[in-house]
Regions:
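RNA substrate-binding interface of SAM-dependent RNA methyltransferases
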Residues: 44, 95-96, 100-188
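Structured adenosyl-cofactor binding patch, chiefly the S-adenosyl-L-methionine
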Residues: 34, 90, 129-130, 144-157, ...
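Short beta->alpha connector loops at strand-helix junctions that form conserved
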Residues: 71-72, 112, 138-139, 161, ...
């Protein structure tokens, strides 16, 4: 195990760039995660952990190839993406996957233009809880492997596949797979979400501000509406996804 005390060390610079730049994460194929829980989840689910940086020696076994580095608290504070560092962070291979020829599962979630990383991570956590088969991102969503997204997913990013697609790729993939797309939308012709057939489907959810884009709406086989009080205009993406996922799971 090595010790690094300089904030200007190349590894520390690399970690700060992973924390702050989605383009750098894509370029390197790596992501940065912070917290002991996420490290345990990554190890349990077979993520390719590369470097562990901690204030105290990590007490649990790791593969021999994992680089382990000790740093003082002030260096940890300078590299951690968290406001309150938890004393350990790690880099790992971003678990991105090529878009498959078909989707073999039963239920998927499509997020369209959801730019808040907390919402994207929470949707990942929720679809994992309700046993959906994966997440498709389109329309400029938040980076699924950014630190805030990974933290909000509570490790689900290591257990459920995530694909980034264009609307055209999304439509082609769903057609090849024989999966209908249900879009959550505030439209007078939308079906009550409690009455939809969820036996096999993808659930499309847009951002709270603009909803689903025209490109994704045009792909939808039907639109569904979550009944709620007329006092409320809309639900945010993560809550809408949770309601529809629960409805499709029960």
């Amino acid at each position: 195990m090595e010790t690094i005390t300089s904030r200007q060390n190349p590894l520390m610079t690399h970690i700060r760039k992973l924390a702050g730049s989605a383009a750098y994460r894509r370029q390197t194929g790596q992501c940065l995660c912070d917290s002991p829980k996420l490290l345990r989840e990554a190890a349990q689910w077979g993520a390719e952990v590369q470097t562990v940086v901690s204030v105290e020696p990590w007490p649990e076994p790791l593969p021999e190839k994992v680089r382990q580095v000790l740093v003082p608290p002030e260096v940890m504070a300078s590299i951690s993406p968290a406001k309150t560092p938890q004393g350990v962070l790690f880099t790992c291979r971003a678990p991105g996957l090529p878009v498959p020829e078909t989707l073999p599962g039963r239920r998927y979630v499509v997020l369209d233009g959801v730019q808040d990383p907390g919402n994207v991570g929470t949707v990942l956590r929720t679809l994992d809880a309700f046993e959906a088969d994966g997440l498709l991102l389109t329309g400029g969503c938040a980076d699924p492997f950014g630190p805030k997204t990974v933290r909000a997913s509570m490790g689900a990013v290591f257990r459920r596949p995530v694909w980034s697609v264009t609307p055209e790729e999304l439509g082609d993939l769903l057609r090849r797979s024989g999966i209908p797309l249900y879009g959550a939308a505030l439209r007078p012709d939308a079906m009550d979400a409690r009455q939809a057939d969820y036996s096999r489907c993808a659930l499309a959810i847009g951002s709270e501000g603009r909803g689903l884009s025209r490109e994704v709406l045009d792909l939808c086989n039907k639109t569904v509406l979550i009944p709620m009080s007329p006092r409320c205009e809309s639900l945010n993406a993560a809550i809408a996804a949770a309601v529809l996922l629960w409805e499709s799971w029960r």
